[in-house]
Amino acid sequence: MDQIPQTQLEPEVRTGEGLSVRRFFTTPGEHPFDSVEWEMRDARIGHGDKVSFEQQGVEFPKSWSQNATNIVAQKYFRGQLGSPTREHSVQQMIGRVAGTIADWGRDRGYFATDDDADTFEAELTHILLHQMAAFNSPVWFNVGFEESPQCSACFILSVEDTMESILEWNTKEGMIFRGGSGSGINLSKIRGSMESLAKGGTASGPVSFMRGADAWAGTIKSGGKTRRAAKMVVLDVDHPDIREFIWCKAKEEDKAAALRDAGFDMSIDGEGFFSIQYQNANNSVRVTERFMQAVENDEEWQLIGRVTGTPIGDPIPARQLMREIAEAAWRCADPGIQYDTTINQWHTSPNSGRINASNPCSEYMHVDNSACNLASLNLMKFRRPDGTFDVASFEHAVDVMFLAQEIIVSPSSYPTEQIGANARAFRQLGMGYANLGAYLMANGVPYDSDAGRGTAAAITALMTGRAYLGSARTAAAMGPYDRYAENRDPHNAVMRMHRDASYAIPDSACSDADLLSAARRSWEEAVELGERTGYRNAQATVLAPTGTISFLMDCDTTGIEPDFSLVKFKELVGGGQMTIVNRTVPLALQTLGYNDEQIEQVVAYVNEHGTIVGAPDLADEHLPVFDVAVGERAISHMGHLKMMGATQPFLSGAISKTVNMPESATVEDIADAYLAAWRLGIKALAIYRDGSKTAQALRTDAQKDAPASKEAEIQKAVAEALAKTPQRRRMPRERRSITHKFSIGGHEGYITAGMYEDGTVGEIFLTDIGKEGST
């Protein structure tokens, strides 16, 4: 892509008189903070006497959980802990963010009147306060705290086939990692290891340079940052070194297994794991329509030299190459696949440059050297008591949040001048949602069903249609994005593709007729207005993993994911934890027509047994409603793929989602999944087969700190327990527990062990895993 000159923050190009903002959630003269009940709490993370974080006397809305209290106080309250400048109230945090964004909007002429600006600030404050939506983490970290804050979590870089460019790539990544964000890059311009250099000899090849970049990322990760360096490395399927790329991480897994067997510490921070290469990046192969057709038709595939652009080496059977991709993923969960033709078919700005790569989690895909700031809506906040979707509230929340994201673009800072220029020239935004799985379950709709997919498609279509309608309205007031003029025809064509896709959602698959009607109407309005005014933003929506911000919003499920399990841990105010049945289970039972007594019996059964199978009075036909990601009734991988296929046509970007497969899955199963995703129109897919990673960070701090004698005692106790006939011991209703944070391949989560009165472990829970680099 041509390098875009640095644009000035002022003046903005304006074609109107600013935007009007209507009141919906708030009342003039009443501050949103007065609409909730507040209470003082202590925020604490740790177990026993070992405390990793504690802040006493923090102020939170009474409706926010203790889980949210702990995470928000630790992650998002700004200022030195223990100092007078340290934030201690959600009022300070939300006021800092909403107030700063509103002031930026005032300064840059976004609002028609002062009253509109005040209304915007009040409505945004209400939305954030009531956990209806949340920005990505860098906004909470930096807005209102730094003069020119870094607000984006997603970056895409580029590299040329020169040593200068390769070294510059490493420098740019380092700057991004230092800020706690992630980046992606396509290395396909770098010549292959079998190609010649101008001054003689052969090239190192991209995989060799990946080794150095991975070490650099690992070093920065261990330099005191709380977020791991997050990377995506992409290579085109016709690159001469594609097979070396496919196998590079799988071969390192063999090394990891050997080190583990030799007694080395292979936990995520262990010295053994630190010597394993390529572990700081997700790898993806870029495949074209032509390659996938060659696989389907059992044709040969030719690799192409980077220097001459001519065939290099002998042709390879396309199916063999696909099998190698699947086998490597079977062994180590890498590489994933990105479907290049599909991605660029939906590209709004192809005349400015093609889409070559993505951010680390694969949801943001746009031109090289660009950025995206994210926000997510909490779908459960738009569920009415009767289960219908509150279209009016959702539309208004989209309007306010999308405008806030747009305002953020210009005053933000960026890691390089070129990224800043492109961010302001294209103004890419990434609105998404969380709690889809909880919403469907609460409505008695199975995740893996036509009704589940139809509902999700309608919600996604409404979100993106409404976002682009807002983008067109902002373009009327502020002007379209700088590169819109050269992309007018393709951008408008993609908008019509989105609109047409909304009419392909079967009416029978969405029981909420008002929701589907609103989705189609939003696209009609967005297309009609946008073709007259243009659009302010080249991209509007993605589906991010929503990691940490899902805790801020008290979500039961993250991103597009189904519920992880039916039983979870609840943090208690004042300390301690207790196991509870997901709050969506009683809602689902109520929706399905069960009475209070039956609901109480089913909930008690689930709490005791950890499964709903066999619960009293529960009809077999209702079991699919309670299918979750893992366990006895786990959703099949095709159920996950079909959900992605149903929602993908309504997103500017893509979907961050790792499709889990059981340990028994075969290489052929994985290859078939890659083919199925292509046929479904999905833009990217990553697969994780249970047990495929040797180095997994499930070793607890307590184990690490235990002396050898204690380790021996533990192993002896485990051996004795295994030798005995199993006997059930009922867990106490309230019990002590230990929670440990872990990371697998850059994806972080929490494992919690609940204990009996004597301190022995009686149950283990794994929370939803969030991914770094996006939220």
Where are these regions (language model features)?
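Core nucleic-acid recognition elements
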Residues: M1-L129, R260, F274
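Active-site cavity-forming subdomains of large catalytic enzyme subunits
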Residues: D2-A43, E54, S152-H396, I407-R424, ...
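Short, Gly/Pro- and small/polar-rich lid/capping loops
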Residues: E17-T27, A518-R532, R699-Y750
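Long, structured ligand/cofactor-binding scaffold of large enzymes
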Residues: Y76-T219
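Core structural elements
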Residues: L124-F141, F402-I408, N422-G444, P545-T546, ...
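Active-site-adjacent structural elements in folded domains
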Residues: V139-N142, I312, P360, Y414-F426, ...
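Catalytic alpha/beta core of large soluble enzyme barrels
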Residues: D214, E363-M365, Q405, V409-S410, ...
